């Protein structure tokens, strides 16, 4: 083999390597050897600065002094001692060494590995990367490269001709992305990977979608013409073409090797799809029982401006080596146009390369000129090889250009005139490569013409099939595979009383098992007293508090074969030290999970996340997309912090099914409640979630219709039993919907907040509205009715009892969206003598449920057309931060609540 030898063939340490530099028989030989070694290190660390990686030659090429021979007292043509371990014996003089290093690090591909901590990884990477210059593609590989380039160019040209004003975000100037993807797919199949999950933005997405991932071109053209991507009878609003997804099986090596590729849906919120793709990959690995990542690979494609500018990229990279989120490494390809809309690199980042973002996790970085598709093909193979060996992320920075503006109707010369003068003079990458291999006699002009005409004819034929008289929808794939047997909610009958109960005897066993530990496992004494023993004492009274109900819900689902994954900050213990799914041995820090040791069919995955909301929630959403057989739960430390993940809520959780027909049963737990903790620890902003609900405010015939058309469920439960049923309902249904829970804080230990196990027995179900237990038997005497939701009920109940307001009924709305019209009507009918109605909430008037419930009460029910608001006045912040004022507000709220 010609090339630089491995630093660490036998996993030598730095010390042993350094020692070999100095241990020679001759001082002069030792000096030369050390100097050459330092020169090699200089090229490896700084050669990238001088590399020819920018096809537009806009990036300054910097020749570091560390590449100068004079710095090491070396001269051109100098002989090399044969005792130098790092240099192959075929390289006998310094000129050969320099030529080798120049080709490896200063040509149209370069690398940065110096920041990597692992000596073994660096040694492997240096050896493999330096070998690439002597690995020339075969004739068939070159033809394959050309065909991928030409197919991309033909697609862009066809679209420009047929739809000249359509914003397709074409790949012209970076067609080598297609070469990279093809190489990654092939190498994945060769390595017996079963799945590649792709998260990518708009640039080049349509090229990949149609020309490589087999999305039917006729369906695509039909959509571009303004038609729906959904066949008749499918409920959904759809999305733009640059967000469309596809799954396909790709065959290679004469159909001897294959890989399943999933290009998942994305929003235009750049990089938000990254953690979604990672989460879906993790779920695939879980179901394949190969958590090491040996069978499923995540491929993320990025734009150069977005990867440097969007914080979710850093959040996602930070997850890459955490045990609860590790997916065995991800291959990143940056489709680098050297511009973001109109933002030039000097305004878009503070470092030289957009790929520098990967250095903080020690990711290898390979930068390649997009005009060198053969190099692109080679480094893409190397990326998969590295990922398979070391199970870590690796980044390819593919530097090209963008032929048009951000979209095809944009004029880029308004802001980048000289850049686009350069671009418009350039031969396209496909045509340049075609000229190259035609000159090599590998492909003829006639073959190129025939291939081009064939591909154009295929697109034209598909275009004709997209006309109204010819078009037929391809089979929909949204409820196939693991999701077969489920339905869209529009097809459900009334499931408002769906039985979600479970055997009382088994629930008691689960609750007992939830605090059972091995005999040699020492639990903290205070925890043993206040948690474990307290739970067992409650069970003797047939009672369960909030955390016990949660354990019973999770445990019973596991008994039925469902898996449960709960993720978030401190979820193993719980923010309020209430959950303790993880117990810690006091002498060894060993973790024990009782629910995973009770012999259930399903598994519980408890993931204490890092301090991220956005990426982690997106990750869990992605996890939820893979299978309906896992209950995915994400809990915020406090509900207030959910706005750190607002993009995830808006673009994925509440709208994903409507846009993309992808169901998710994710549960989002948001501790909420006004207890004097101030603006950052009081409110999950209920009002914002309710504003996202797509349920009708008026013209509603019955609750069945509402359940059929809702995009998610929002509940504010006030009893452990109702929380128990809500969690189980998520899995017992034959469809999946996101569930947002305004969860409790003080109710976790409130003496009156408990449920009996009989309330969770077979035949019981989630109660959308809870009747007033204190007035249900004397309803005719009630003159005033309070409607409320959440923990404020307990304050109102206590005040009513203390002040003997016996003519007031208090009705709890446990489910706010979809709005339980019929159940509310039943309660109104129950109190037929009531003449006054009020909505009472602890939130401010411009928060909480009021803006959502007001039009529904006033327009649906004649009796409540004059319903009164009782609560805090409007506030700019979510809560008062002055404790004395908070206490006064609580007192005033209770006074007002019973004086209307």
Curated annotation (Swiss-Prot):
Its cofactor is thiamine diphosphate. Its EC number is 1.2.4.-. GO terms for cellular component: mitochondrion. The keyword tRNA-binding does not apply. Gene3D superfamilies: 3.40.50.12470, 3.40.50.970, Multifunctional 2-oxoglutarate metabolism enzyme, C-terminal domain, TPP helical domain. It is found in: Mitochondrion. The keyword Transit peptide applies. Its main location: mitochondrion. Keywords: Glycolysis, Mitochondrion, Oxidoreductase, Thiamine pyrophosphate, Transit peptide. It catalyses: N(6)-[(R)-lipoyl]-L-lysyl-[protein] + 2-oxoadipate + H(+) = N(6)-[(R)-S(8)-glutaryldihydrolipoyl]-L-lysyl-[protein] + CO2. 2-oxoadipate dehydrogenase (E1a) component of the 2-oxoadipate dehydrogenase complex (OADHC). Participates in the first step, rate limiting for the overall conversion of 2-oxoadipate (alpha-ketoadipate) to glutaryl-CoA and CO(2) catalyzed by the whole OADHC. Catalyzes the irreversible decarboxylation of 2-oxoadipate via the thiamine diphosphate (ThDP) cofactor and subsequent transfer of the decarboxylated acyl intermediate on an oxidized dihydrolipoyl group that is covalently amidated to the E2 enzyme (dihydrolipoyllysine-residue succinyltransferase or DLST). Belongs to the alpha-ketoglutarate dehydrogenase family. PANTHER family: 2-OXOADIPATE DEHYDROGENASE COMPLEX COMPONENT E1 (PTHR23152:SF4), 2-OXOGLUTARATE DEHYDROGENASE (PTHR23152). This is Probable 2-oxoadipate dehydrogenase complex component E1 homolog. It comes from Dictyostelium discoideum.
């Amino acid at each position: 083999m010609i090339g630089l030898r491995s630093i660490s063939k036998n996993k030598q340490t730095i010390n042993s390597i350094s020692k070999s530099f100095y241990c020679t028989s001759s001082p002069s030989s030792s000096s030369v050897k050390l100097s050459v070694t330092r020169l090699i290190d200089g090229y490896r660390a700084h050669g990238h600065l001088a590399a020819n990686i920018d096809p537009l030659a806009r990036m300054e090429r910097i020749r570091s002094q560390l590449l100068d021979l004079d710095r090491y007292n070396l001269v051109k043509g100098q002989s090399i001692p044969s005792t130098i371990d790092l240099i192959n014996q075929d390289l006998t003089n310094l000129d050969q060494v320099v030529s080798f290093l120049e080709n490896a690090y200063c040509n149209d591909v370069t690398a940065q590995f110096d920041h990597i901590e692992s000596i073994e990884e660096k040694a492997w990477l240096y050896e493999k990367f330096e070998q690439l210059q002597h690995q020339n593609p075969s004739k068939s590989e070159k033809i394959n490269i050309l065909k991928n380039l030409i197919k991309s160019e033909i697609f862009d040209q066809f679209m420009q001709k047929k739809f000249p004003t359509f914003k397709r975000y074409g790949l012209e100037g970076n067609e080598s992305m297609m070469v990279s993807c093809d190489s990654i797919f092939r190498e994945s199949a060769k390595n017996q990977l079963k799945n590649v999950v792709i998260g990518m933005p708009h640039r080049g997405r349509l090229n990949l979608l149609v020309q490589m991932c087999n999305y039917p071109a006729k369906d695509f053209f039909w959509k571009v013409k303004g038609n729906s991507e959904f066949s008749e009878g499918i409920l959904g609003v759809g999305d733009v073409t640059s967000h469309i997804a596809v799954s396909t099986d790709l065959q290679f090596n004469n159909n001897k090797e294959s890989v399943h590729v999933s290009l998942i849906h994305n929003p235009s919120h750049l990089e938000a799809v990254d953690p979604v793709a990672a989460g879906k990959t993790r779920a695939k690995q879980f179901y394949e029982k190969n958590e090491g990542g040996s069978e499923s690979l995540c491929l993320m494609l990025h734009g150069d401006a977005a990867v440097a500018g969007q914080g979710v990229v850093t959040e996602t990279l930070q997850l890459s080596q955490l045990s609860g989120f590790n997916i065995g490494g991800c291959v990143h390809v940056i489709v680098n146009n050297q511009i973001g809309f109109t933002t030039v690199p000097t305004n878009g980042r503070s470092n030289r390369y957009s790929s520098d973002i990967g250095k903080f996790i020690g990711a290898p970085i390979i930068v390649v000129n997009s005009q060198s598709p053969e190099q692109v093909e080679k480094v893409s193979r190397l990326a998969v090889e590295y990922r398979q060996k070391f199970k870590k992320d690796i980044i390819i920075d593919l530097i090209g250009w963008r032929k048009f503006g951000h979209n095809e109707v944009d004029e880029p010369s308004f802001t980048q005139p000289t850049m686009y003068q350069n671009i418009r003079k350039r031969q396209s990458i496909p045509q340049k490569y075609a000229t190259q291999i035609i000159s090599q006699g590998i492909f003829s002009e006639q073959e190129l013409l025939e291939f081009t005409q064939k591909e154009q004819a295929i697109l034209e034929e598909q275009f004709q099939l997209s006309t109204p008289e010819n078009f037929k929808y391809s089979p929909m794939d949204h409820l196939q595979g693991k999701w077969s047997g489920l339905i869209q909610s529009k097809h459900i009958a009334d499931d408002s009383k769906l039985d979600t109960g479970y055997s009382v005897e088994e629930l008691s066993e689960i609750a007992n098992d939830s605090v059972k530990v091995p005999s040699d496992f020492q639990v903290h004494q205070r925890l043993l007293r206040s948690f474990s023993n307290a739970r067992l004492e409650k069970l003797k009274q047939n009672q369960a508090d909030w955390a016990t109900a949660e354990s019973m819900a999770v445990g019973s689902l596991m008994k039925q074969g469902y898996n449960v994954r709960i993720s978030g900050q401190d979820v193993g213990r719980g923010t309020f030290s209430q959950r303790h799914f993880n117990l810690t041995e006091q002498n060894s820090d060993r973790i024990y999970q009782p629910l995973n040791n009770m012999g259930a069919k399903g598994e519980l995955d408890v993931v204490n996340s890092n301090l991220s909301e956005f990426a982690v929630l997106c990750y869990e959403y992605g996890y939820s997309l893979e299978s309906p057989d896992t209950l995915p739960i994400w809990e915020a430390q406090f509900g207030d912090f959910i706005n750190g993940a607002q993009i995830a809520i808006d673009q994925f959780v509440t709208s994903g099914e409507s846009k993309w027909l992808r169901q998710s049963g994710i549960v989002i737990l948001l501790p909420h409640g006004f207890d004097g903790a101030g603006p950052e620890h009081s409110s999950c902003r209920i009002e914002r979630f309710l504003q996202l609900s797509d349920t009708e405010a008026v013209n509603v015939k019955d609750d069945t219709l509402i359940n059929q058309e809702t995009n998610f469920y929002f509940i504010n439960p006030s009893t452990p039993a109702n929380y128990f049923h809500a969690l189980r309902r998520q899995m017992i249904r034959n469809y999946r919907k996101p569930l947002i829970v305004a969860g409790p804080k003080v109710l976790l230990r409130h003496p009156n907040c408990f449920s009996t196990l009989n309330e969770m027995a077979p035949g019981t179900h989630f109660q959308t509205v809870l009747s007033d237990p204190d007035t249900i038997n004397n309803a005719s005497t009630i003159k005033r009715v309070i409607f409320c939701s959440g923990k404020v009920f307990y304050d109102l109940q206590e005040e009513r009892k203390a002040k003997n307001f016996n003519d007031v009924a208090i009705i709890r709305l446990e489910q706010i969206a979809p709005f339980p019209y019929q159940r509310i009507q039943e309660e109104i009918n129950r109190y037929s003598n009531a003449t006054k109605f009020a909505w009472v909430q602890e939130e401010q008037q411009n928060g909480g449920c009021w803006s959502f419930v007001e039009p529904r009460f006033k327009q649906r029910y004649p009796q409540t057309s004059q319903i009164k608001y009782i609560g805090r006045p409007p506030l700019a912040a979510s809560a008062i931060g002055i404790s004395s004022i908070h206490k006064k507000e609580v007192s005033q709220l209770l006074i007002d609540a019973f004086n209307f």
